[in-house]
Amino acid sequence: MPNWCINKLVIQGDPEDMEQLVRIVEGDSSAFSLNSVMKMPQELKDASSPERDGDTAKENIDKYGAKDWYDWAVKNWGTKWDVNAQIVSDVTSPMLPGLRTVSYEFDSAWNPPLNVYDVLAARFPNTNIYACWDESGCDFAGYRMYKNGELLKQVDQDSYSGRYSHYNPTDDIFDYFPSEKEVEKLRKQEEERRMADLNVQTALLRMQNLINNL
């Protein structure tokens, strides 16, 4: 029986990107699945028991880089078993209108699936990802934040501190790292505002010239 690590995964992005992401991570199960992000080879998945010895283990290592399903899961997902996590929150953020924020919660065996978060971030670089975990049995916790497909920040701490400092994040966790699409949108809005101000100034200058010429 493993120690269970509790996890929260919060993903934010443009509605179109988020629709594609949710469709991929949930697959056919309507729940977040590690296997939907990083697929275990069917040959290993269908094995009735671990194949750790002999020719079969060697063949599996040559083909898949792992002796059996357990070895593959730990190396690729970072945890022993797949998860089956339902969406616990799906909203449009009031802080950044037009962005969809989806949250999942789930338990994983022994460790958080950090490798899966890396793959998700790289596959969907226009999204923001916040992932946190708390494993009280071995007394560790932490969180990761991703932007532009890359790890922006990671914090590791003991379970007690982590439980109260990051496991229940507020909407403002994403305030300081908007996605590239949001940055571009804000950039365009700023350019439009600047051009509008310039047009007003030009019109006022022309009006002043007309008055001076009367």
Q: What annotation goes with each model-predicted range?
A:
Residues 1-214:
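Intrinsic low-complexity, intrinsically disordered or marginally ordered coil/linker segments
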